[in-house]
Amino acid sequence: MEKEKFSFKSVDGNTAAAIGSYKFTEVAAIFPITPSSPMAEHVDEYASQGMKNAFGDVVKVAEMQSEAGASGAVHGALQGGSLATTYTASQGLLLMIPNIYKWVGEELPAVLHVAARALASRSLSIFGDQADIYACRQTGACMICSHSVQEIADLAPLAHLVAIKASTPVIHFFDGFRTSHEIQNVEFINDEFWKNLLDKDAVANFKKRALNPHGHAVTRGGAENDDICFQGREAQNLHEEKIVDVACEYFQKVSEATGRPYAPFVYFGDPNATKVIIAMGSVTETAIEVVTDLMKKGEKVGLIKVHLYRPFSVKHLMATIPASVKKIAVLDRTKEPGSDGEPLYLDVVAALRQGGREDIEVLGGRYGISSRDTQPKHIKSVFDFLDASKTWTGFTVGIDDDVTHLSIPVDENYAIAHSYTSCLFYGLGSDGTVSANKSSIKIIGDETHQYAQAYFAYDSRKSGGVTRSHLRFGKQPIHSTYYVENADFVSCSLDSYI
């Protein structure tokens, strides 16, 4: 695709999702919840400015009384023939689950954009992991994962195209804070490309299915008895089977346009790798750095990124795993008490059994819960652990577990050399440090023709807490989705911090 068909802008993940989703949304039902709130705010702002979607209309935005109300409004809009979208996270997503089941059964093209966040259990955490996403895996909704801000820009509109053509609800998710609030300079595909990909016949068929007593009367959402309900549910297998094909079709078209690889599962690493990590979310960007570094040192390692989590395609996973692989570590960003393994790990184990690769040793581990930082040394330690004399599933990485002793040893001396410049700013909540750094990194990214990245860490307090601004910029793409540890420049706003 010619370069003039792209535009470049420094944005965070939430902004990229809002821009992408607005194109194919007719009704947006919203309710704020951290860290997804900016998506809804941006869509509301675009609508108030009179911005047109791909259909030439201004999006109708309705703020509801809760996330349950937002999902109900989406359901009603879809039944009435409007393409509807919502944005949420954490407990808000849980409140939507009853309606998600209905959207799936009624084959409605709802789209949820989720900045994945921890669920409140022993304590409340507003920070990111994927517990909320995994709670939806049994609903039957299609689930698409973006691993970076750039991928959000590419896959947010793709999620809508899949929903429309496959007549299925789609949950498009990415890591809360680490990706939703990270700023990167992003390449946006221009609107004409997306309009050309839209299946207009599918849109027309969806409109025809709208509940309308005047000429298109149908019965929907009735009650069935035991003599027929089972058969009807199984008959939907034919519909569900086409979702993977539709997703693959759009993955391929976006890959061809951008040069960025998209598929249900994407492999990165040595073609003859013996050790592979499987994960989804921002940690895969860090893993790319580690795999690249270890390959230079002669190690045969690889990474599999999960883009299509549901439906989970055994066929595509088997085709992605190199024949040489002997050991796999599956990393889950959640903890599911009482289970014999975390969700992605169990999916991979079952897939390997179905695919005839029971020769592969598989270990499952947890990382990054509640936005716990995952550094390159942690990924390196996972590869090392696969070769350890004593291994176990259920390991943790990134913490020192001195209670249940499930954490694995970490090589504290491991580090990756980078050519970019890194900066670390310590500030006081509401003192303007974060806002100034957001402006600075956008100027660098938009005006200096350099790659730029910014991430901001702070506690749950609205003001008065410690803030840390992690800035990086350089001549090469930046995949460092972790805190700056060895900064070239450090700023401190308060003497007391020193």
Predicted regions and their residues:
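Thiamine diphosphate
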Residues: 1-135, 140, 157, 376, ...
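Glycine-/acidic-rich phosphate or pyrophosphate-binding loops and their flanking alpha/beta elements
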Residues: 10-16, 251-275, 288, 406-420
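Anionic-ligand anchoring segments at beta-strand to alpha-helix junctions in alpha/beta enzyme folds, i.e.
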Residues: 26-63, 271-272, 276-307, 419-486, ...
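Conformationally flexible catalytic loops at phosphate/diphosphate-handling active centers
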Residues: 55-59, 170-266
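A structural-propensity feature for long, helix-poor, extended segments
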Residues: 65-67, 122-141, 317-336, 456-494
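Conserved thiamine diphosphate
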Residues: 126-176, 200, 350, 354-368
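Terminal amphipathic helices with adjacent charged low-complexity linkers/tails
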Residues: 173-214, 319-356, 363
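Peripheral docking tails and interdomain loops at the edges
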Residues: 327-416
